[in-house]
């Protein structure tokens, strides 16, 4: 009998081992599948899609460094440098000797202007792999960003000692020598860069730029033309060739090249600005004005754009608009004497003599401070000690990325930066194909998943931020399913149709239901908030009509009102009293606080939502927008990175705008 028991036990162990082995093998197969799929996405520049595959690979094997590293590469290409940094750091926690992770993390630090950390990473990488020429090139680039050009040259020398045919090393060394005011040596290196990689557009372009600085216009033009032969869609080459045309006096040819830049790169504010300046110099103010408007739309904090647009309005004798633009310039840079003087002149034209005189006196006080013999002129700018302030008010966006490249890089997409809406339970007849997602974000819970698996498949329920009217095709479906309480089905149907009062009545009947009460409360909070916003909009419309009927020339003081969200807030508080871990209720409460302009309570509510549902991408996104509004950009950018990682593509456009 003992022997029989031991045999049974042996067979049990064998069976258990085979089960465990099959699970391990399956996990490895799935991991490799998603790594391969992600690599294919990376190679085809589908960076956003690759992140999803690497996320899945990490779920199968959270201790394998490869998925983190590749996901970091994808985030880097989406300009999510903080997210990339986190993934490269995680890679090194798992594999402390992985040179490529040090290399890429160093480059990421460099992009974030963390030059000390970048040099530390390159140093560590070179300790592991001292004969890696690419590492020496990357280290040289960081030295250049620190204006340590001699050190940069030494790094490039080492790279060329390892690989004497490395075009990029010659290219970068040539640029470094140009900064060291060794133009002839710089040209020699740039000649070698072209020689060793004839089809390197960058080498032709940079050599042309150095020749341009040396006033060798004819040969510079030849290099730019050759660069365009290799890459006719490169906006930076057209931009540089336009400068060459200007230097040789061919303004019309320069204008054509600038126009080509904006055809390829529609958000290149620097080029719009240059075009506007050229039109202004030609006294074509009517053509300059719309270009300045594009600049202010892209870079609303650029002081020169407002200042020059003000001058353009003045030349067109639109003096009030001119004064308004000079005011914007003054708000951005209060010590801009020229803006005070110009506004003084504009106000004089508007017969505002007192305002004109006050502006003139302010300008004179600024000029006097600049000319104060006892002080340093720079002292006037001491209050703006943070250099990023000047970067913000003087810099113009100019990525020089053409339209085709923008299509694969979601950070360049045009998005309306607005928070995601509240979450409610909606029915949908959409049927995604296997492996595909619905065209909007959805979430599910155990009860909802069980219901979806048991119904007749005419529709499914999902928790979503998509507006209710999107689901009109499924509005009557719940009414036909006997397992759904009639009142809840009626509430959903009325919510989709926009009949708020009927929906509210129906949901109140269901709010204490043991199974459907939670979802009734969620939906009820959304409907109550929507009704409050509708009532506020109607009231504002009535006020606007009464205001337009007034004969007074004075502008009435209109109090900015907020919708009455109290009923919606009370429903959510009641739900949270009985189910404190309901992430979706916390999220909806966060939205109500945000709409009420209670920003810190909104952040707290979103944080609770994330605590109980770490994959709630919209909570990260909305919390990030709230933090941005409060000026907490670093915290916001971390949230945006997480939102993008979880699948919200809009996050990368916001990162591009606020996290660089």
Where are these regions (language model features)?
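Alpha-helical segment of the N-proximal tetratricopeptide repeat
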Residues: 29-60, 73, 77, 107, ...
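Helix-start (N-cap) detector for alpha-helical repeat units in TPR-like alpha-solenoids
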Residues: 30-32, 65-66, 99-100, 133-134, ...
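Position-specific recognition of the canonical hydrophobic site in helix A of tetratricopeptide repeat
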Residues: 35, 42, 69, 75-76, ...
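Canonical tetratricopeptide repeat
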Residues: 36, 70, 104, 138, ...
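Structural marker of alpha-solenoid helical repeat scaffolds
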Residues: 60, 94, 128, 162, ...
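Alpha-helical adaptor scaffolds
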Residues: 304, 311, 526-530, 542-600, ...
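Eukaryotic alpha-helical solenoid repeat scaffolds
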Residues: 315, 337-502, 542-567
